[in-house]
C-alpha cells in the first residue's frame, strides 16, 4: 500500500490530489486547491509552502509527484511557476518524501491515452478511474492525474524489474 500526493503547481492556484494504491487498485483520499490571494510573490510562496506542508501532515503520503515546468511563452510566468514548484518540492523534501516529476504530456498520455488531451478529458478520466461522483475541479483533477501517473509508472517499473530478475534467474539455472 502507498499513499501518493500529486501536485499541479501554479503561482496563484496549486492543485493537490491524494490517492491510495493497493496493488493495482486506486482509491481517492482527497483533493482541492491552495489559493494564494495575495499579490506579492514572496507572500504567495510562503502560503504555498505552508499549504503543501499542511497537506503532507494531514495525509502522510509515501510519495510526492509534481508536474514538470513547461516552457511558457511568458518568461515571467515561467519563472514564477518554477519558484512555486520549488517551494512545493522543498516542503516535500523537508518531510523526507521522495519526489517524482512528470511532464504534462506524459500525465495526459497515461490518464487519457492522448498526450494532447484537453482539461475536460483529464477531469472525466480521473472521475472514472477513481470512481468519483462528479468531476473534480480542473487543478485538483490535474493533481490527481499526476498521482495516478506515478502509480502507473512505478507499477510498470516494478514489473520490468521483476521480469529482469526472472530472466536473470532463468540464466542462472
From Swiss-Prot:
Keyword terms, alphabetized: Cytoplasm, DNA damage, DNA recombination, DNA repair, DNA-binding, Endonuclease, Hydrolase, Magnesium, Metal-binding, Nuclease
Co-factor remark: Binds 2 Mg(2+) ion per subunit.
EC number(s) stated in the UniProt entry for this protein: 3.1.21.10
Gene this chain is encoded by: ruvC
Name under which the protein is recorded: Crossover junction endodeoxyribonuclease RuvC
Organism: Shigella sonnei (strain Ss046)
Cellular compartments per GO CC: cytoplasm; Holliday junction resolvase complex
Subunit structure: Homodimer which binds Holliday junction (HJ) DNA. The HJ becomes 2-fold symmetrical on binding to RuvC with unstacked arms; it has a different conformation from HJ DNA in complex with RuvA. In the full resolvosome a probable DNA-RuvA(4)-RuvB(12)-RuvC(2) complex forms which resolves the HJ.
Reaction catalyzed: Endonucleolytic cleavage at a junction such as a reciprocal single-stranded crossover between two homologous DNA duplexes (Holliday junction)
Amino acid at each position: 500500500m502507498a499513499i501518493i500526493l500529486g501536485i499541479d503547481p501554479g503561482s496563484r492556484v496549486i492543485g493537490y490530489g491524494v490517492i491510495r494504491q493497493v496493488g493495482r487498485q486506486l482509491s481517492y483520499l482527497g483533493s482541492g486547491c491552495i489559493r494564494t490571494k495575495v499579490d506579492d510573490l514572496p507572500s504567495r510562496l510562503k502560503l504555498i509552502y505552508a499549504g503543501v506542508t499542511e497537506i503532507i501532515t494531514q495525509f502522510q503520503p509515501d510519495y510526492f509527484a509534481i508536474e514538470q515546468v513547461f516552457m511558457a511563452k511568458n518568461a515571467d510566468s515561467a519563472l514564477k511557476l518554477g519558484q512555486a514548484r520549488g517551494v512545493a518540492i522543498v516542503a516535500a523534501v523537508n518531510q523526507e518524501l521522495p519526489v517524482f516529476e512528470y511532464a504534462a504530456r506524459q500525465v495526459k498520455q497515461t490518464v487519457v491515452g492522448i498526450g494532447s488531451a484537453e482539461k475536460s478529458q483529464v477531469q472525466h478520466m480521473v472521475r472514472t478511474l477513481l470512481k468519483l461522483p462528479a468531476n473534480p475541479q480542473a487543478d485538483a483533477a490535474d493533481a490527481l492525474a499526476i498521482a495516478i501517473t506515478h502509480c502507473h509508472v512505478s507499477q510498470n517499473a516494478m514489473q520490468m524489474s521483476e521480469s529482469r530478475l526472472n530472466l536473470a534467474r532463468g540464466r542462472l539455472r
